[in-house]
Amino acid sequence: MTIALTGGGTGGHLAIVRCLLESAIKKNIECVYIGSQNGQDKAWFENEVRFKEKFFLSSKGVVNQSKFDKISSLLHTLKLSKDCREIFKKYHIQAVFSVGGYSAAPASFAALFSHLPLFIHEQNSKSGSLNMLLKPFATKFFSAFEKEISPYPVADKFFDNARIRKELKNIIFLGGSQGAQFINELALNLAPKLQEQNIKIIHQCGKNDFEKCKKHYQSLNIQADIFDFSLNLEEKMKNADLAISRAGASTLFELCANTLPTIFIPYPYAAKNHQYFNAKFLQDQALCQIFMQNSINLDEFFKSILKLNLENISTRLQNITQKNGADMLIQKALFDNLTFIR
């Protein structure tokens, strides 16, 4: 069997693609990847040899575009979907699995036009525009946030490095794969207070702010573990006892898998405020704290860091997600629904 995996744009979407690829390989399913020249798709998968083939199309997002540009983008997407249909024919694609993001649009529409099963994984608590549009036509729609809960695909390495946290010795600041200026500034402002408490700092700051953050820590004579980006983030997480993080869905569930207590600062400009609702999923279970970016008081924030019951939260995070989530999605989509697959 050969399937197409499509979608991306950001690290969160692409992490799911990688999990699905690894699970498909276990079942001897070959995968063709269809992504975009824009975003992070090529950086993640251009050299990924486990795909049967990879295609990076000229797809682009429509968020914040004018009405005319949105129409133009839609017409371009329809043109690219025709190219995808040719890819489906050439590689005998039997089903399409979308993880969302604008780079999923051409192949997803092509699946509908070609009468192929379309499976969609929605990573966020608030569905993106493309997934909302396609959901009624999908063969199966998966979400970790809906009533019929599906496991969120998280790489095994985050579970393998999990441990119960009991004492705050190390704190990690996570701004996402591209860094977050606000979280970087927060980390630098908190650094002297953390040093007074003998709390060590691990800081993912992104490429743009790396030199600035490095020099600031040096000026404070603080030995922070600072890095711009890491493909082995689980190695950094396992050394931390608390995380300060944005609330992208993949990051959130990776933190859960690692049983790492977290204070979330949702990105305030995320579409439909989905990062806040992602974090609220945990807050409603008393499993995290949320601070809104525009109302943070440094002293109050620091007090919250020291007050968290790390052991209680870390222990209960074990029940939020489960290992082999991607395996379950592949099983549900392609084997429990064999009548859909020609």
From Swiss-Prot:
Pathway: Cell wall biogenesis; peptidoglycan biosynthesis. UDP-N-acetyl-alpha-D-glucosamine binds at T10, G11, G12, N124, S177, Q275. GO terms for biological process: carbohydrate metabolic process; cell division; cell wall organization; lipid glycosylation; peptidoglycan biosynthetic process; regulation of cell shape. It catalyses: di-trans,octa-cis-undecaprenyl diphospho-N-acetyl-alpha-D-muramoyl-L-alanyl-D-glutamyl-meso-2,6-diaminopimeloyl-D-alanyl-D-alanine + UDP-N-acetyl-alpha-D-glucosamine = di-trans,octa-cis-undecaprenyl diphospho-[N-acetyl-alpha-D-glucosaminyl-(1->4)]-N-acetyl-alpha-D-muramoyl-L-alanyl-D-glutamyl-meso-2,6-diaminopimeloyl-D-alanyl-D-alanine + UDP + H(+). The keyword Electron transport does not apply. The keyword Glycosyltransferase applies. It is a peripheral membrane protein. NCBIfam families: murG (TIGR01133). Cell wall formation. Catalyzes the transfer of a GlcNAc subunit on undecaprenyl-pyrophosphoryl-MurNAc-pentapeptide (lipid intermediate I) to form undecaprenyl-pyrophosphoryl-MurNAc-(pentapeptide)GlcNAc (lipid intermediate II). This is UDP-N-acetylglucosamine--N-acetylmuramyl-(pentapeptide) pyrophosphoryl-undecaprenol N-acetylglucosamine transferase. It comes from Campylobacter jejuni subsp. jejuni serotype O:2 (strain ATCC 700819 / NCTC 11168).
